Design a protein with these regions (language model features):
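Two-component histidine kinase catalytic core, primarily the HATPase_c
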Residues: 40
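Phosphopantetheine-dependent thiolation modules in NRPS/PKS and related acyl-activating systems
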Residues: 1-36, 44-46, 51-80
Length: 80
């Protein structure tokens, strides 16, 4: 399973099924398109840390705007 697929699963889990895979396009804005808020983002990051065995910089991740940026950022942590 790719990083993108795992991140999409995490987002769907956090949004409790209110989003579908069809909505999770790489260019999707996390806030306006996917309707995430800061609490959702925090939960996603905690689950990403557990799933990928990484430690993320919350401040850096708050600057991420799209799904593609989030996936790229997580990949950076995984290879660091």
């Amino acid at each position: 399973m790719t990083t993108n697929e795992k991140v999409c699963e995490i987002i769907i889990k956090v949004k409790k099924g209110k989003l579908t895979l069809d909505q999770l396009k790489p260019e999707a804005d996390l806030y306006s398109d996917l309707d995430l808020d800061s609490l959702d983002l925090s939960e996603i990051l905690v689950l990403a840390e557990e799933t990928f065995n990484i430690s993320v910089d919350i401040g850096k991740e708050q600057q991420v705007k799209t799904l593609a940026e989030m996936v790229a950022s997580i990949d950076e942590y995984r290879t660091a």
